[in-house]
């Protein structure tokens, strides 16, 4: 499944991006990280495109209270809006 994630940042884009680039979640464990794309909307918003996501694995990693992701992201992320992305077929 392909996703578009709108990240609402409570620190700053640069602070969040440094953590995102360090990859404490181990994105390669649940998505094709070679295709991951990140865009800055403004200093408190980013858009992340994830491809071939294993939703179960992602859920387990992101929500594991023992994961290093939980504490680090709590300092930087207010919330995430997650959207499923599908290719559209042309109308008949």
PLM feature spans:
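Short acidic, gly/pro-rich beta-turn/loop elements at beta-sheet edges
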Residues: 15-17, 58-60, 92
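Unusually extended, aromatic-enriched hydrophobic runs near protein termini
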Residues: 1-2, 31, 49, 91-92
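Helix N-terminus capping/helix-initiation residues
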Residues: 12, 42, 75-77
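Short, surface-exposed ligand-recognition loops at beta-strand->loop->(often short) alpha-helix junctions
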Residues: 8-19
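Short, well-ordered beta-strand segments in beta-rich or mixed alpha/beta enzyme
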Residues: 2-9, 37-65
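Short, low-order "capping/linker" segments at domain edges
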Residues: 84-92
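An amphipathic, aromatic/His-enriched active-site/gating alpha helix that lines ligand/cofactor pockets
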Residues: 21-37, 53-84
